[in-house]
Amino acid sequence: MDFLLLGLCLYWLLRRPSGVVLCLLGACFQMLPAAPSGCPQLCRCEGRLLYCEALNLTEAPHNLSGLLGLSLRYNSLSELRAGQFTGLMQLTWLYLDHNHICSVQGDAFQKLRRVKELTLSSNQITQLPNTTFRPMPNLRSVDLSYNKLQALAPDLFHGLRKLTTLHMRANAIQFVPVRIFQDCRSLKFLDIGYNQLKSLARNSFAGLFKLTELHLEHNDLVKVNFAHFPRLISLHSLCLRRNKVAIVVSSLDWVWNLEKMDLSGNEIEYMEPHVFETVPHLQSLQLDSNRLTYIEPRILNSWKSLTSITLAGNLWDCGRNVCALASWLNNFQGRYDGNLQCASPEYAQGEDVLDAVYAFHLCEDGAEPTSGHLLSAVTNRSDLGPPASSATTLADGGEGQHDGTFEPATVALPGGEHAENAVQIHKVVTGTMALIFSFLIVVLVLYVSWKCFPASLRQLRQCFVTQRRKQKQKQTMHQMAAMSAQEYYVDYKPNHIEGALVIINEYGSCTCHQQPARECEV
């Protein structure tokens, strides 16, 4: 538009006297964008872009005009005063992150109408006036993350119809005002993660028809109601990781195009049976590290488009209600973490869910959960309230509110006696199989040795034969020695003659009388 006016001005001046032409021509040239003045000391200039970074500046440089971009990152700015950037009417982006800014006046960005990108992250801002962004209607991206914002002014984002990206991560925000984003019709990315949100109002996100990604992770939310996200028809990704959510419900029956949902790291114990019927296009779901004990068959039926799911780290009850989940996992063609462990009952603690179903014959009187039979083994719950216990009593032949996929049936769950018998049988079978396996290994080793090392086996056999022969020789010698000793004592006959014995020496002779021997009883 400026160039069109300039052309008309020149055309009109060419038809006037020369003096008038020169005067008016000078006035017209003042309408042109001013060239940037000299580059401030220690700053870096690249054409009409100025970078004054990490210089410990406490104020913005003065006498700057004609700039298209200004970066004052990593300095020591503490306050943004009214009219501080008045001369930068051509500015399109402004970086003020990593300073010590704690106060922003309402008219600090006056006359910065052309700014499209504003970064105020990593400062100490505690509040922003309602009129902070009013002078910048062309904003596309605003970064307020890593500050100390505790509350948001109700009209803070009023008039920002071109805003597409908004970062408010890692503040201390406790509440999102109703319809605060009403004018942000072009917003596609919104991050309010790592704050202190305890609840959400029903119309907090009203007007965000083009929003595709919403981050609410690491807050203090205790309940998720899908009615809090009305008419977010373009939303594809919702992150609610690491909150304190215990219940997931949906009080509005409407369909949205959500494809990815992260609910991991919460305290979820109950989900309404129809809660996922409002997201028929859901492809990725994270439910790991919660307190789920079972999943309703109606919920499993609504997971028709899933290609990825995580369920580990929950308190799975491997009892009456595990059959539907086991069958669904058997038939699931996508990716899942595969580390689902039983938390109860006691005899199944620590076992993999699918292994427990097979080992303890939990479903259909011991039948294995295959080919979708298990999904019809559990009756759909008719009530929508939280379960009184993880093992809900099923009525024989009763009819619940269901969508026609599951048929009512009874599930045989082993009692205490049957469970103990099953455990004992399982141990006996396991021990027998281990023994047979060990025997087969020994036979295999002998067979391989006989085939591969025949000479060694012959030597080993000769050693055994020689050793046995030596043992026999020793036994024979011992027997012969014992027999000779017995014959010596049995055949002994004394040759002495009863009477006097005369011993003669050089001094004379002695006479002694030998008495016959007597046997004494001992």
Curated annotation (Swiss-Prot):
Keywords, comma-separated and alphabetical: Cell membrane, Glycoprotein, Leucine-rich repeat, Membrane, Postsynaptic cell membrane, Repeat, Signal, Synapse, Transmembrane, Transmembrane helix
Superkingdom of this protein's organism: Eukaryota
PROSITE patterns: LRR (PS51450)
Assigned GO CC terms: axon; endoplasmic reticulum; extracellular matrix; extracellular space; GABA-ergic synapse; growth cone; postsynaptic specialization membrane
Main localization category: membrane
Extracellular side: 35-427
Spans traversing the lipid bilayer: 428-448
GO biological process: establishment of localization in cell; exploration behavior; locomotory behavior; long-term synaptic potentiation; negative regulation of receptor internalization; positive regulation of synapse assembly; protein localization to synapse; receptor internalization
Tissue: Predominantly expressed in forebrain regions including thalamus and cerebral cortex.
Claim: Nucleus is one of the keywords in the record: no
Any Pfam family the entry gives: LRR_8
Family assignment from sequence similarity: Belongs to the LRRTM family.
Stated role: Exhibits strong synaptogenic activity, restricted to excitatory presynaptic differentiation, acting at both pre- and postsynaptic level.
Protein name: Leucine-rich repeat transmembrane neuronal protein 1
